[in-house]
Amino acid sequence: MIENWPKKPEGSQWTDDQWKAVVANGRDILVAAAAGSGKTAVLVERIIKKIINEENPVDVDRLLVVTFTNAAAQEMKNRIGEALEKVLIDEPGSQHIRKQLSLLNKASISTIHSFCLQVIRGYYYMLDVDPRFRIANQTENELLKEEVLDDILEEEYGIEDNTIFFELVDRYTSDRSDDDLQRMILALHTESRAHPNPEKWLDKLVEAYDVEGKTIEDLVYASYLLEDVKFQLETAEQHIRKATELAMLPDGPAPRVETLQADLALLGTLSSAARESWTSVYEAMQNVSWQTLKRIKKSDYNEDIVKQVDSLRNKAKDEVKKLQEELFSRRPESFLRDFQDMHPVLEKLVQLVKVFTERFQAMKRDKGMVDFTDLEHFCLQILSEQSEDGEMKPSAVALQYRNKFAEVLVDEYQDTNFVQESIIKFVTKDSESEGNLFMVGDVKQSIYRFRLAEPGLFLGKYKRFTQEGLGGGMKIDLAKNFRSRHEVLAGTNFIFKQIMGEEVGEIDYDADAELKLGATYPEGEDVAAELLCIQQTEEEVIDGEEGAEVEKAQLEARLMAQRIKAMVDSGYEVYDRKTDSMRPVQYRDFVILLRSMPWAPQIMEELKLQGIPVYADLATGYFEATEVNIMMNVFRVIDNPMQDIPLAAVLRSPIVGLNDEELATLRAHGKKGSFYEVMSSFLKGAPLEEEKELHDKLEWFYNLLQGWREFARQQSLSDLIWKVYGETGYYDFVGGLPAGKQRQANLRVLYDRARQYEATSFRGLFRFLRFIERILERGDDMGTARALGEQEDVVRIMTIHKSKGLEFPVVFVAGLGRRFNTQDLMKRFLLHKDFGFGSQFIDPRKRIKYTTLSQLAIKRKMKMELIAEEMRVLYVALTRAKEKLILIGTVKDANKEMEKWLDAREYSEWLLPDHIRAGASCYLDWIAPSLYRHRDSEMLLELGQGSIPDEIYGYDTSWKVEVVDGNTLLAPEPVQEEKQELLEALREKKAVPLQSERKDEVYDRLMWKYGYEEATSHRAKQSVTEIKRNYQSEEGSDNAFIKKLRAPIQTRPRFMEKKGLTYAERGTAVHAVMQHVDLKKPITVEVLQEQIAGMVNKELLTFEQAEEIAVEKVISFFDSDLGKRVLAAKSVEREVPFTMMLAAEEAYQDWQGKSGESILVQGVIDCMIEEEDGITLIDFKTDTIEGKFPGGFEQAKPILEERYKVQLSLYAKALEKSLQHPVKEKCLYFFDGNHVIKVEE
């Protein structure tokens, strides 16, 4: 078969491996295509060759081409179309080519989901599904899941004697909610749907916990953990061997060698036990005993070597101690008891998952909708049937597709999942050695495990297939990179040859996997790859992890901004392939890659400050945009106007336009009740002249609101939104603001979002608001509407995932010091495709919980998979660069980190030890140790080659490795220049001037005093009562010193106290009655008592307060001259709240600060009446007078007048400021004795 392949044409640009990938056939073929290797061109050429094959031409619709994205599918069709048109130019009479062009549009070149959809549309009658089904929106799907799950759990809670369910609830929920249980059910449902047979996977999960009659050696978890035990013991042995080598050096502590040899023997015993069984290791661990180190005279040996030896030995002991504590502190049989105890609970959990899946599928079926996992499973259901042995086999439909497709070509095969693999398997030939499946991908770029992609499928075939394809499938390596300069490729290879291996990384980065130079570039300047490690100084480290992250982002952003600006300003040159010449770099040539986007806004801000145009698709901030936020609040108010915060936001917005004072005035009309109730009440009455403008604004909005609420009940949501835009004029208004086009685009997106929502199974405004809340809860904010095109001359910021498949002349990879995200490993329960379910053992009755064997195994497995995934993410980032690669990371303590990274220099193998690679917590933990073994790090380290082999130390790659002081980045530019001059002078041993032009500035700063020191000892906001007390205290009437000298009043014990209201509570009750008494009705005992009873019913008074009201004293007031004036007044206002600014010297008699300072004063005026000749202010008092003053009221009057003079003066000032009318009279009314005092200034 191989001999029949066409030979590569003379002068062809295809490499031998590329040509092999184009023409090889007759078996399943796996093409491992490295980054930039031209895999898409190879794929297109292969398809064209099959179509135009003279002996056996294939129609394009007999090929199934599966791509990862719709954009890739369209690009593939375009490329094939262009290639066919070129062929047609050479063969204008070819009917076959013309036919292919006509077939191209309906050819099966699509994503796997589009192919599934095509199958389902064709064979829907084999399923219980409406042929008019639609694809569900993700948020809609989530809301449906909530509904189904709530119903199921409600039913379960209602079942009597549901013992196992309540056991499940007790173990996995908190006292407040069952959110954790809901998360478990949903997670198990999602994970199960990634398998061809979800129910079977769930059943296996339960079976794993049925350990009746088994030993610990029978458990898959124990087998895996034993491998990990061997790994950790091997790490411990490496530490001891290294310590032994150091101890045997000329200056080494030789007496330590004997003990170290004993340590090695002990570790050897443990390793032998680990190769036998779990029980053997357990028994060996119980007998671990470390010898005591012999005392030595440290001055006789090199102190650093002694420290290293002791440190390495302690690391080895810690490895063993960790194993003892985590795995071997319990007897093996106790682990088995955990599984047996958890088995019925897990069985119940899985039953709930199955019920949920069944109900969820039924609900989607009823609503005529499917999700993307349904597409895969429905397609698989059509293509498969169950054989007699219970396994899945191809159905008649699958056999039809097998006959139809001459070849199935899968792009990005490394990102395929188990279900997709099964679908592909059923439409291709059974035998790999005679197969028709062509797969292209790069497992080193498999970075979608979080989407349940399974790189193991690619790896399995890569290990199984051979280069010759004898007896099975064939693998072809496309290692030549046609994208990048030598410096980028060699730099990437140098790092990955040291960090990526099968044990840690899942694939060997061997000679076949290495990137090989395929591109030609002219000589360039400053093209070496760079590692810039920023030292975050103590002054820069902010308390808290979040603060430190903010600071790191700022430092890296500043450094990148400086470098980009410098490269652009200096005319740094990059190669332009179109003109085949070098040209000055432009902003569009730069990209900043981040693992995730939280730093992006800060980086954007910094670049903008430096005048650098920048673009990032943040996919956040849309709902935070002011115009969107205001509109969302309008819709919340339309849905439910009783919500105070949204309503206040709308009233304060430009739509209604109330200012702070008007909002406060409205609230003053009703302390109780919602804003909406107060507004409704306010609009029912006739407004005061000064409130007419406020009344008009509110009346306009109130009428609109009622119309919108009625409209919302009858019409579509999208129509309502456009109606609100039109009737408020808000859409036109935002168009006139700065960035008006952007704002209007955001409002149009909201309208479009509503239309999309209405295309779902949900309806109505309330549901829409819940729909949006769900989006925000999931963190799926949409990002503001795009106002900048991607082709603009701007620096781009994007995630590494988004950059996959793209290339840029200059690449910054930032945030390399950020810790890997290990949150998934910290969850209360863990799920794994192979190991199933793992959680802590929880006994709610004994109130104990501890780690189980399954949890330990799954956590370890997931950690190793996470490490492998992060390696692949880093590989994708580094291979985006065409000409210049700059890596940036920030550390808190560079010296401490360097000391850790320098351990790598002690090893002579290319691949760094597993424990160094597996122990990495960030990308720098891989990059820095790798580069510290290269000669170019000598500019930083000055340590020489040491024991590093020549092939590593002198590897053909160019690097600049630098530690950057964070202070120089945060300092202003002039300071940096001055510092540089001083450093240069110091290096050349020149005198440094002691004087500086900044001397005066430094002196002023050191001697500076805060100009408002007095203000720091006084409150900026005071109540009238507090100011009154302040005056009394200053005058000595409330002197704290005198209080101390008074004999303490002995209070009665509580059980002897007479129950009743306090003086303050009585006073509050009287004021409440005076506020609410109806002045239009006769003031009689019966009427007052009826009104007081009504106040109790409305909860304005308590029953106890009502009992204490002296009705006759209230009547006495209204019988008095002052009370009659109240009844006869033009207008009466009661309990009027106010705030005003007051000069600080008026509020504080001890004020020594600057004049002109103000404080905020707030208070409540009991009563004000407007008469023909002016305004009178009345303050009601419930002070005790009768019997307290020997001289009666005449003695009390001057004292009481002095006590309340300041208070009434402030009330009067507040009224005069707000009403612009003088207060003619200020009166105190005392209920005790029916006394009136007119207070004069």
From Swiss-Prot:
Requisite cofactors = Mg(2+)
Residues recorded as binding ATP, renumbered to this chain, are 33-40
Q: Name one GO cellular component term.
A: DNA helicase complex
Q: How does it assemble?
A: Heterodimer of AddA and AddB/RexB.
* Presence of the UniProt keyword ATP-binding in the record: yes
Recorded catalytic reaction(s): these are: Couples ATP hydrolysis with the unwinding of duplex DNA by translocating in the 3'-5' direction; ATP + H2O = ADP + phosphate + H(+)
Which EC number applies? 3.1.-.-, 5.6.2.4
What InterPro entries has UniProt attached to this entry? AddA, DNA_helicase_UvrD-like_C, DNA_helicase_UvrD/REP, P-loop_NTPase, PDDEXK-like_dom_sf, PDDEXK_AddAB-type, Restrct_endonuc-II-like, UvrD-like_ATP-bd
The record's annotation in SUPFAM superfamilies points to: P-loop containing nucleoside triphosphate hydrolases (SSF52540), Restriction endonuclease-like (SSF52980)
Source domain of life: Bacteria
> What does this protein do, in the record's words?
The heterodimer acts as both an ATP-dependent DNA helicase and an ATP-dependent, dual-direction single-stranded exonuclease. Recognizes the chi site generating a DNA molecule suitable for the initiation of homologous recombination. The AddA nuclease domain is required for chi fragment generation; this subunit has the helicase and 3' -> 5' nuclease activities.
Output one GO BP term: double-strand break repair via homologous recombination
> Which protein family is it in?
Belongs to the helicase family. AddA subfamily.
Q: Outline the extent of the UvrD-like helicase ATP-binding domain.
A: 12-485
Q: List the disulfide bonds.
A: none
One GO term in the molecular function aspect is:
ATP hydrolysis activity
Under the heading Pfam families, the entry gives: PDDEXK_1, UvrD-helicase, UvrD_C
The record places domain UvrD-like helicase C-terminal at 505-805
Could you list this entry's UniProt keywords, alphabetically sorted.
Answer: ATP-binding, DNA damage, DNA repair, DNA-binding, Exonuclease, Helicase, Hydrolase, Isomerase, Nuclease, Nucleotide-binding
| Glycoprotein keyword on record | no
Q: What is this protein called?
A: ATP-dependent helicase/nuclease subunit A
